[in-house]
């Protein structure tokens, strides 16, 4: 993307952001690349065999409603595969390292928990803190540091909801609400970074919220607790 020439300048914005390091980048990838991936995303929702999804049916626990995912790159069409391969490539990792200051940042080629995500009408993702370590990505335990979310909806009516909310560390309220715009990327350090889209989607039947998610790791442990699963906001605390 165009941002490759500006890692140092973006680093000041990223590291100096309110509450925790984060940045929103529009026009992130080449338009031809993102348009092809967006077409792939629409095709996947309607054509992929059920057993290829991370959830055999839409997940229906009360913190993650009507959401499905495809973490296996082999189950994705070619244009989406190309995006995933680029996001895990050494040139892109070098950009992330410069922007974040995390020198040993590594990708997860298995896309564990990430990859293609779709949420259907009525669906939501409660405010949560992500799982933050893996034992099977490297010889030693590694720790999740950065999330990158890339939106694939060609047209999204703001009245449908689904905006990403970044919350204050004290869990009192969101401090930033980010609209779904195709080719918009949201990057943030996950430590002390509650987030989600907690309000049910109000989109019409046949519409859905589509995105790609990528997670990046380091050998440096976090200063907060270790979580082997997502921790969900319940009654003012993460459980």
What are these model-derived regions, one by one?
Residues 147-149:
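Eukaryotic charged/polar low-complexity linker/IDR segments
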Residues 24-26, 115-117, 187, 213-216:
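Short beta-strand segments
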Residues 1-18, 229-239:
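Fe(II)/2-oxoglutarate
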Residues 3, 30, 80, 89-93, ...:
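A structural signal for well-ordered alpha-helical scaffolds and beta->alpha junctions
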Residues 11-99:
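Non-heme Fe(II)/2-oxoglutarate
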Residues 49, 57-70, 99-108, 112, ...:
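A structural signal for the main folded, soluble domain(s) of proteins
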Residues 39-42, 72-78, 83-143, 155:
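Non-heme Fe(II) oxygenase catalytic core, chiefly the N-lobe of the double-stranded beta-helix
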Residues 122, 130-144, 153-239:
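Catalytic core of Fe(II)/2-oxoglutarate
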